[in-house]
Amino acid sequence: MTVCVAQAERGASELESKAMVKKSNDAALLVAHRIAEVVRSKPNCVLGLATGSTPIPVYQELARLHREEGLDFSQVRTFNLDEYAGLPPTHDQSYRFFMEEHLFSKVNIKPENVHFLSGLAIRAEDECIRYENALQTIGPCDVWLLGIGHNGHIAFNEPGSPRDSRTRVVCLTQSTIDANARFFGNDKSKVPTKALSVGIATIMESREILLLATGESKCEAVTKAIVGEPTNAVPASLLQRHPRCCFYVDEAAGAEVAETVTE
C-alpha cells in the first residue's frame, strides 16, 4: 500500500510518497490524473466509482480533461459502489442522480456502459446478486475509487463487515446516518437506514484501488486505516492487504499518519 500525502510548507516525510503538493484539492487532481492515465492506456477499462462530496473535484477534473483535452469515455464501463434503498434514480440524493450530475452528463460515456444498483428493486437481494454477477462478468475493475467514512467504512461496508462480503443489503450505522444527514437538509429522519453495497471482497478484486480522503474530520479514520492492524472493525484498514492500493490524503486528513511515521 502506498500513501500519498498532500503537504503544505513542510519537508517530505518518510512515507512511501509519490507526491507532495500544497493544496487539498491537489490530492483529488492526482487521483483524476491517475484515472485518466488508465482510460488513455485502456480505452475500454472498467472503473469503480464513489459518491459523496470528496470525489466531486475528481469528477470535475475528469470532465475538464474530456472537454479540453479530449479524454475519451466512449468505451469506458463503470460500476458504482452503492445505492440507498428506497430512493428512485430521480431523487437528488440517489447516487445515480449524483453521477449524472457530476460526471456522466459532462463526458461522452454511453448509457449502456454505466451500471448501478437499483434502490427500488422489489427483491433487493436478487438485485445484489445481479449486480455482483455483472461485476464478475465485465470486471474486475481496473481502478476502484473509494472514499472513507468517519468510522472507517468503505462503500457502505460498516465496521464488522466480513472480509469475504459480496454485494448485499446493509443496515447503516447511526454514525453514518448522522454524517450523511447534511445531504438531506440535516434531517436524520430522511436518511435511508438501508443501502445496497458492493462487498469488501468485491472491492479487493479490483486491479488498483485509489482511496481519497480530505479534511480534518477524516484524520482519525485515515490513521486507523493506514497505521493500525488490518481489522474488519475498520474496514478501510483491510486495504493494506491489497497489492496496488494508494491512499491520497491531504495534509489535514494525513496529519497523524505523517507524525506517526516520522517520529
Swiss-Prot record:
<dbReference type="GO" id="GO:0006043">
    <property type="term" value="P:glucosamine catabolic process"/>
</dbReference>
<keyword id="KW-0119">Carbohydrate metabolism</keyword>
<dbReference type="GO" id="GO:0005737">
    <property type="term" value="C:cytoplasm"/>
</dbReference>
<comment type="similarity">
    <text>Belongs to the glucosamine/galactosamine-6-phosphate isomerase family.</text>
</comment>
<dbReference type="GO" id="GO:0042802">
    <property type="term" value="F:identical protein binding"/>
</dbReference>
<dbReference type="GO" id="GO:0005975">
    <property type="term" value="P:carbohydrate metabolic process"/>
</dbReference>
<comment type="subunit">
    <text>Homohexamer.</text>
</comment>
<dbReference type="GO" id="GO:0019262">
    <property type="term" value="P:N-acetylneuraminate catabolic process"/>
</dbReference>
<dbReference type="GO" id="GO:0006046">
    <property type="term" value="P:N-acetylglucosamine catabolic process"/>
</dbReference>
<dbReference type="GO" id="GO:0004342">
    <property type="term" value="F:glucosamine-6-phosphate deaminase activity"/>
</dbReference>
<comment type="function">
    <text>Catalyzes the reversible conversion of alpha-D-glucosamine 6-phosphate (GlcN-6P) into beta-D-fructose 6-phosphate (Fru-6P) and ammonium ion, a regulatory reaction step in de novo uridine diphosphate-N-acetyl-alpha-D-glucosamine (UDP-GlcNAc) biosynthesis via hexosamine pathway.</text>
</comment>
<feature type="active site" description="Proton acceptor; for ring-opening step">
    <location>
        <position position="153"/>
    </location>
</feature>
<dbReference type="Pfam" id="PF01182">
    <property type="entry name" value="Glucosamine_iso"/>
</dbReference>
<dbReference type="InterPro" id="IPR018321">
    <property type="entry name" value="Glucosamine6P_isomerase_CS"/>
</dbReference>
<keyword id="KW-0378">Hydrolase</keyword>
<feature type="active site" description="Proton acceptor; for enolization step">
    <location>
        <position position="82"/>
    </location>
</feature>
<dbReference type="InterPro" id="IPR006148">
    <property type="entry name" value="Glc/Gal-6P_isomerase"/>
</dbReference>
<dbReference type="InterPro" id="IPR004547">
    <property type="entry name" value="Glucosamine6P_isomerase"/>
</dbReference>
<dbReference type="InterPro" id="IPR037171">
    <property type="entry name" value="NagB/RpiA_transferase-like"/>
</dbReference>
<feature type="active site" description="For ring-opening step">
    <location>
        <position position="151"/>
    </location>
</feature>
<protein>
    <recommendedName>
        <fullName>Glucosamine-6-phosphate deaminase 2</fullName>
        <ecNumber>3.5.99.6</ecNumber>
    </recommendedName>
</protein>
<feature type="active site" description="For ring-opening step">
    <location>
        <position position="158"/>
    </location>
</feature>
